[in-house]
């Protein structure tokens, strides 16, 4: 009987913690939405001011830092940039057929075959 009661208590605790977690997420979401969307400084496109170094206080819980949207967007396009820089998209200007060459050539280097 005690075991059953214990199991019920544990289940209730789990449920309570889950709902508290959900509530916390909701509150954080609402808090983040309340901030003003655009700051004047973020709209100056090509102005990079020197960043001040801030001393960070260590927090107990792991804090997920959100990157600025500009950096996130730049990172998003970076892989495309490298893709197009690679020789896969820019084969040699004189098209070299692999069968006419004395040495084997990688398929990647001339993708037109």
Curated annotation (Swiss-Prot):
Protein name (record): Putative uncharacterized protein YOR053W
Keywords of the record: Membrane, Transmembrane, Transmembrane helix
Q: What is its main location?
A: membrane
What further note is attached to this protein's record?
Answer: Almost completely overlaps VHS3.
- Enumerate the transmembrane spans: 4-26
Topology relative to the lipid bilayer, per the entry, is: Single-pass membrane protein
Cellular component terms (Gene Ontology): membrane
Subcellular locations according to the entry = Membrane
Specify where the region named Disordered lies, as residue ranges. 32-74
Domain of life, source organism:
Eukaryota
């Amino acid at each position: 009987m005690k075991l059953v009661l214990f199991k019920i208590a544990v289940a209730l605790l789990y449920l309570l913690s889950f709902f508290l977690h959900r509530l916390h997420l909701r509150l954080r979401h609402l808090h983040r939405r309340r901030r003003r969307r655009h700051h004047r400084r973020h709209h100056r496109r090509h102005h990079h001011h020197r960043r001040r170094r801030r001393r960070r206080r260590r927090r107990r819980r792991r804090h997920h830092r959100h990157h600025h949207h500009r950096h996130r967007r730049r990172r998003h396009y970076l892989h495309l940039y490298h893709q197009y820089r690679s020789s896969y998209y820019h084969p040699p200007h004189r098209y070299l057929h692999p069968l006419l060459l004395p040495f084997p050539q990688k398929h990647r280097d001339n993708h037109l075959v």
